[in-house]
C-alpha cells in the first residue's frame, strides 16, 4: 500500500499529471482489503466484501484521486451507524485500530475520515468540532473544517482559538491552517478575506509554537491576510519584530507576497532600499524563445555603497495573456548581503516548458530585474510556437 504523507506531499499543491496518477492509486484493492479488515475488527456487523464490492461498482477505475476519495466517503457511510455521533465514535475506534496496525498519522489515503465529518456532520456542530480534534491527529482536517467556519462563523472560530492552545501540534496547526482566508485548493472564506481580525488571536497564540509545521501555517495564514489586508500584516510585523528568531521567520515568510509586490513599508521594515545598487549589462541572450525551451538572460550587479547592503534580487516575467495584455509574475533569485563595491554577474534561465498550471501565448513578452522592490528597465523577447 502507498504511504503518502500530507506533511511531505501536499496533494493540493501537486500539479504533475504523472504524480496525480500515482496518488489516485493509493485507493487500490490492497488498500480496501486492509482498511476493511481494520473496520471489521471494531465493527462486528461490517461486511468487508460487500464494502469492497460497493467501492468497485460502476466507474471506479475511471475516477481520479479526489473522486475516489469522495466515493469512499459515500460508500463508507452506507456501512456506518446512521446516527452521526455513533458514526464518529466508530471512526475513533477505527483510527485507533489503524494505529495499532502501524498506520501513522498524515497518511493521505485516510483523508476520507475528515471528508465524512464535512459531508454528514455540518448540522451537528458540537459532535463535529470534537471529531475534528481527534481525527486531525491522524489525518489533516484543514479542508473539511472550512464549511463549518462559513456556517458557524465566530462560534467555530472560538473553537479554533481553543485548538490553538491544544497539546497536540496537529490540532494547533488545524486552528491556523483551517482558518486561512485563502487556503489553496479549498473554498475561500469571504468574511475572513474582508476582515480577518477574529482569527488574529489564533496567530498570536501560535507565533512562538515549538513546531515548525505549525509556524509555517501561521506564516501562510499571514500571507493570505496580506493579499487583502496588507496593513494588518504590516502592524503584526512591527509588533512581533525581534521577539525570537522563529517569530522573525514567520513574518518574513508571511510577508512574501508584500515583498514580491515591492510594498514600501515592508521593504523599509527589512531595510531594503536600492540606492547605489547598480544594474548593468542587462541582456536577453535568447530574444526569440520557442515554447518548450528556456529564456536565457544575464546582468551585472554592483553595490556602490560604502557599506554592506542586503539585496533582495528578483526578476519579473510579463507574460502575454489570451486577450493580449501582459500579466506580471515575480521570481526570487536571492536575498543576501553584498559588501561595499562588490560586483556579481548573474546568469539565469527561465523555463517555457509546457506545464499544467500555465498556458503560454505566443507573441511579445517582457522581462525586468527587481532590486529591493525597485523594477529596472524592461526588455522584450518573443515567444514562438
Each predicted region: which residue ranges?
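Short beta-strand elements
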Residues: 374-385
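Short beta-strand segments of immunoglobulin-like
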Residues: 283-290
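Proline/serine/threonine-rich low-complexity linkers at boundaries of modular beta-sandwich domains
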Residues: 265-279
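A beta-strand/beta-hairpin structural motif
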Residues: 297, 328-355, 383
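Surface-facing alpha-helical segments and adjacent helix-coil boundary elements at the starts of domains
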Residues: 2-266, 290, 307
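Beta-strand-rich binding/interaction modules
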Residues: 293-302, 306-321
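Short glycine/proline/serine/threonine-rich loop/turn segments at secondary-structure transition edges
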Residues: 354-364
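Short beta-strand and strand-turn-strand segments in soluble, beta-rich domains
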Residues: 277-280, 321-335
Amino acid at each position: 500500500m502507498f504511504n503518502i504523507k500530507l506533511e511531505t506531499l501536499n496533494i493540493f499543491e501537486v500539479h504533475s499529471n504523472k504524480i496525480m496518477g500515482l496518488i489516485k492509486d493509493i485507493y487500490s484493492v490492497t488498500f480496501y482489503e486492509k482498511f476493511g479488515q481494520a473496520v471489521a475488527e471494531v465493527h462486528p456487523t461490517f461486511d468487508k466484501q460487500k464494502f469492497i464490492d460497493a467501492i468497485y461498482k460502476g466507474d471506479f477505475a475511471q475516477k481520479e484521486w479526489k473522486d475516489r476519495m469522495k466515493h469512499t466517503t459515500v460508500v463508507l457511510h452506507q456501512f456506518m451507524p446512521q446516527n452521526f455521533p455513533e458514526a464518529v465514535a466508530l471512526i475513533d475506534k477505527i483510527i485507533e485500530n489503524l494505529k495499532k496496525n502501524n498506520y501513522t498519522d498524515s497518511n493521505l489515503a485516510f483523508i476520507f475520515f475528515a471528508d465524512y465529518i464535512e459531508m454528514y456532520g455540518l448540522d451537528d456542530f458540537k459532535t463535529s468540532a470534537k471529531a475534528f480534534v481527534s481525527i486531525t491527529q491522524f489525518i489533516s482536517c484543514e479542508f473539511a473544517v472550512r464549511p463549518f467556519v462559513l456556517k458557524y462563523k465566530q462560534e467555530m472560530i472560538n473553537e479554533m482559538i481553543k485548538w490553538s492552545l491544544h497539546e497536540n501540534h496537529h490540532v494547533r496547526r488545524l486552528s491556523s491552517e483551517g482558518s486561512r482566508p485563502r487556503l489553496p485548493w479549498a473554498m475561500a472564506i469571504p468574511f475572513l478575506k474582508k476582515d480577518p481580525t477574529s482569527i488574529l488571536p489564533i496567530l498570536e497564540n501560535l507565533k512562538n509554537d515549538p513546531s515548525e509545521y505549525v509556524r509555517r501555517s501561521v506564516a501562510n495564514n499571514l500571507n493570505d491576510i496580506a493579499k487583502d489586508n496588507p496593513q494588518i500584516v504590516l502592524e503584526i510585523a512591527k509588533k512581533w519584530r525581534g521577539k525570537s528568531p522563529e517569530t522573525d521567520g514567520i513574518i518574513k515568510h508571511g510577508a512574501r507576497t508584500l515583498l514580491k509586490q515591492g510594498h514600501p513599508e515592508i521593504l523599509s521594515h527589512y531595510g531594503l532600499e536600492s540606492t547605489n545598487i547598480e544594474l548593468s549589462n542587462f541582456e536577453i541572450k535568447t530574444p526569440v524563445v520557442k515554447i518548450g525551451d528556456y529564456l536565457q538572460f544575464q546582468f551585472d550587479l554592483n553595490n556602490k555603497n560604502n557599506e554592506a547592503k542586503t539585496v533582495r534580487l528578483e526578476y519579473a516575467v510579463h507574460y502575454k495573456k489570451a486577450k493580449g495584455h501582459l500579466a506580471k509574475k515575480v521570481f526570487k533569485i536571492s536575498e543576501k548581503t553584498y559588501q561595499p563595491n562588490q560586483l556579481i554577474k548573474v546568469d539565469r534561465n527561465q523555463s517555457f516548458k509546457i506545464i499544467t498550471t500555465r498556458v503560454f501565448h505566443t507573441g511579445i513578452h517582457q522581462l525586468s530585474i527587481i532590486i529591493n522592490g525597485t523594477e529596472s528597465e524592461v526588455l522584450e523577447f518573443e515567444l514562438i510556437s
